[in-house]
């Protein structure tokens, strides 16, 4: 029993290399430690795990470094792929030499070839086509690989797809509400009491019938007059001076009853045709005045001719 207690008390000693006076004694203790570790029950190992970790493990540090590299390997790979300098190549020349003529013509240069060393001004000019490097198509290698390996470049495309999907989903109710409302509205008003229902519930029916407004709009009614009505209205308008005054209400009402036209319609007709007929009257008056002047001139000329004949 004392040996067992001594073994329990001396278990951590072989781990520390400073103890052990002789080499053989240290060797025996080290050998006994391996033997005890192999023959110890599981409960004894559990008690050892509760103790602080051994110094060699902390001193070497291989376990911690391994875990650290193991957990950060994916991030390092993606980060290295992002910061890696891409290989840029300039391919065929895209300069349009017929732009002034409104056409499209290229020189046929297939790849940019610098005229000088890197860093010099001549390196920006192509030795084949003598065009600037910006005219050549730029091709970057490694962009697809970096975006595919990096986890930060994979979320935005999915997010855009989801946003587009949400837009489609949000647009569907607006597209589906109108046909359903119209169908329900028609179903409710297919009976014989539809007109009475619309008159009683004017607010709700007006809001529900908004989609059908372009189809339910009626054309404005235009009154058609006979030639006799037009002549009588024209003569009456000229008499009253193309204005209806309050003192003439009785006369206007009597005239409207005679020709079969409402007072409001007569007033609108006079307002719309006042300028038109006034221009015609002015033109007719000018023509009449010109005819009178011409007639007077002809009379004077004929009189002068007679006088010339009589005098000799």
From Swiss-Prot:
ZnF (ZF-HD dimerization-type) residues: 90-139
GO cellular component entries: nucleus
Any one GO MF annotation of this record: DNA binding
Upregulation: Induced by exposure to long days.
Listed NCBIfam families: homeo_ZF_HD, ZF_HD_prot_N
Oligomeric and partner information: Homo- and heterodimer with other ZFHD proteins. Interacts with ZHD1, ZHD2, ZHD5, ZHD7, ZHD8, ZHD10 and ZHD11.
Annotated PANTHER family: ZINC-FINGER HOMEODOMAIN PROTEIN 2 (PTHR31948), ZINC-FINGER HOMEODOMAIN PROTEIN 4 (PTHR31948:SF177)
Name of the protein this chain belongs to: Zinc-finger homeodomain protein 4
Lineage: Eukaryota, Viridiplantae, Streptophyta, Embryophyta, Tracheophyta
Gene it is expressed from: ZHD4
